[in-house]
């Protein structure tokens, strides 16, 4: 494995630091984030971003005595002279643009090499999750639900990046930047601090975090390929693929005592690995102790190689028929439908029990209500409340905002096998919309509905998304009937709904 890592890291890039002073780098970042207005300058600079100010900020960072600055300093201090958080976004955007350039070039060159594509031929796009759930899950028996741990300190992310990029001034400046903005005086960076940094510098943080995930996944793929490509050895049992030669003789002796015969070979099952955001699942058809082996690999990999502490309770192995796992904002499990069939052969009659596995994909109502309560559409009990911050808009805009949220949820959860459970969410949004309109007109809900006659208009909240297909297919069409009965996955749902993203 060490040889593999050294070979993969041999393609390192130099001289990234001078790019931080190139004006076109910040021009690219400005064009990419124009609507976010993070490059608008402070008062007195004519509301334009300036490379000169960025250079001055970099110079001040080098001249500042870091032993004087406290981690609890206010957003404005003598070091900056301006808004600290505001200009940190400017520099972090420049960091993200610069550091993405060599990896984009490396990816482009790698795609041209046939052996790279052949090596990663089992990797799939994120959109392949949907056919995986539909086609594979009913044939699997065990699932391991894993939450990927966050690094305890951002220095770990920087060290991982150092394996790939050799540029001492660049990393010196990177540490200097993180020291000023991420409370590096603390031995352990709290999850709250990381969350604050990720929200204020989303592009830069996502690059560091995704690079950390990509690094451990590349090692996992390497171990998986090595374990599945071993030749069959007679009269041997291989549970551990790492250092298995030393354990071969001992394992054979142990199993010879416990069983009346010796196994010829114990082959690993095909492991399905799926990751989305900060969670991943391992699914397998065979015995759970092999799943437990891979879970131990993950724990040791995170703790020993990445210095990331992960508690064993963050990894759970459960039968799919008894446990629901959360992925893509859904609760999914495999339900066993049992039926008894009467059969007769000659004069003998007997009963046959048939077990059919069916994939259940359920809408997580309680987490959705928590998300709506956090967004101030209802309270924690699911009782709809008004949205006063929208009361200044016109009636049409208020209704349109609520309808877009409701249709987005319906669009997202069209893959559910029980769409009627969404009626409660639609009712909360509908009643919150009515209360917001009544609050705007300074009236009660009943008086507002009686005066404006808006009840028929608000029935759009309960319009099913499949009804749109009735405009394309005839009402008696078999295609339309299948659309109402089956699940429909839309490929754009990975980006459309912020309420259901895994945290």
Curated annotation (Swiss-Prot):
The keyword ATP-binding does not apply. It comes from Vicia villosa. Keywords: Chloroplast, mRNA processing, Plastid, RNA-binding, tRNA processing. Its main location: plastid. It is found in: Plastid, Chloroplast. It holds the Pfam family Intron_maturas2. The keyword Transcription does not apply. Usually encoded in the trnK tRNA gene intron. Probably assists in splicing its own and other chloroplast group II introns. Belongs to the intron maturase 2 family. MatK subfamily. It comes from the Eukaryota. GO terms for biological process: mRNA processing; RNA splicing; tRNA processing. This is Maturase K. One of its GO terms (cellular component) is chloroplast. PANTHER family: MATURASE K. GO terms for molecular function: RNA binding.
């Amino acid at each position: 494995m060490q040889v593999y890592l050294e070979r993969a890291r041999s393609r390192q890039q130099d001289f990234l630091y001078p790019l931080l002073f190139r004006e076109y780098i910040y021009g690219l970042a400005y064009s990419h984030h124009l609507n976010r207005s993070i490059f608008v300058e402070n008062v007195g600079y004519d509301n334009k971003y300036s490379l000169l100010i960025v250079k001055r900020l970099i110079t001040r960072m080098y001249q500042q005595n870091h032993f004087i600055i406290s981690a609890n300093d206010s957003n404005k201090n003598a070091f900056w002279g301006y808004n600290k958080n505001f200009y940190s976004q400017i520099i972090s955007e420049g960091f993200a643009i610069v550091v993405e350039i060599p990896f984009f070039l490396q990816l482009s060159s790698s795609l041209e090499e046939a052996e790279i594509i052949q090596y990663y031929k089992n990797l799939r796009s994120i959109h392949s999750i949907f056919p995986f759930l539909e086609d594979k899950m009913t044939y699997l028996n065990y699932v391991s639900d894993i939450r990927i741990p966050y690094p305890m300190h951002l220095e770990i992310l920087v060290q991982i990046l150092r394996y790939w990029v050799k540029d001492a001034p660049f990393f010196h400046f990177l540490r200097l930047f993180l020291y000023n903005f991420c409370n590096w005086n603390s031995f352990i960076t709290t999850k709250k601090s990381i969350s604050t940094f990720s929200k204020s510098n989303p592009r830069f943080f996502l690059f560091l975090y995704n690079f950390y995930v990509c690094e451990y996944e590349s090692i996992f793929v390497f171990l998986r390929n090595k374990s599945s490509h071993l030749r069959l050895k007679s009269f041997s049992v291989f549970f551990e693929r790492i250092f298995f030669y030393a354990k071969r003789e001992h394992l054979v002796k142990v199993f010879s005592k416990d069983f009346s015969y010796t196994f010829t070979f114990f082959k690993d099952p095909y492991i399905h690995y799926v990751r989305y955001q900060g969670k991943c699942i391992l699914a397998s058809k065979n015995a759970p102790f092999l799943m437990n082996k891979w879970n131990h690999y993950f724990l040791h990999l995170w703790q020993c190689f990445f210095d990331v502490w992960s508690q064993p309770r963050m990894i759970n192995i459960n039968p799919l028929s008894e446990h629901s796992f959360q992925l893509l904002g859904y609760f999914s499990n495999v339900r066993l439908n049992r039926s008894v069939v009467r059969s007769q052969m000659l004069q003998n009659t007997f009963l046959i029990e048939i077990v059919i596995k069916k994939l259940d994909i359920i809408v997580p109502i309680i987490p959705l209500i928590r998300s709506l309560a956090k967004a101030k559409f209802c309270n924690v009990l699911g009782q709809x409340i008004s949205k006063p911050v929208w009361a200044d808009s016109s009636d049409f805009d208020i209704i349109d905002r609520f309808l877009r949220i409701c249709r987005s949820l319906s669009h997202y959860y069209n893959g559910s096998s029980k769409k009627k459970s969404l009626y409660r969410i639609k009712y909360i949004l509908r009643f919150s919309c009515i209360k917001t309109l009544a609050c705007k007109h300074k009236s009660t809900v009943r008086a507002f509905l009686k005066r404006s006659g808006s009840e028929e208009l608000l029935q759009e909240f309960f319009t099913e998304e499949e009804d749109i297909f009735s405009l394309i297919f005839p009402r008696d069409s078999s295609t339309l009937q299948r659309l109402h009965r089956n699940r429909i996955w839309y490929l754009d749902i990975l980006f459309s709904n912020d309420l259901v993203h895994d945290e």
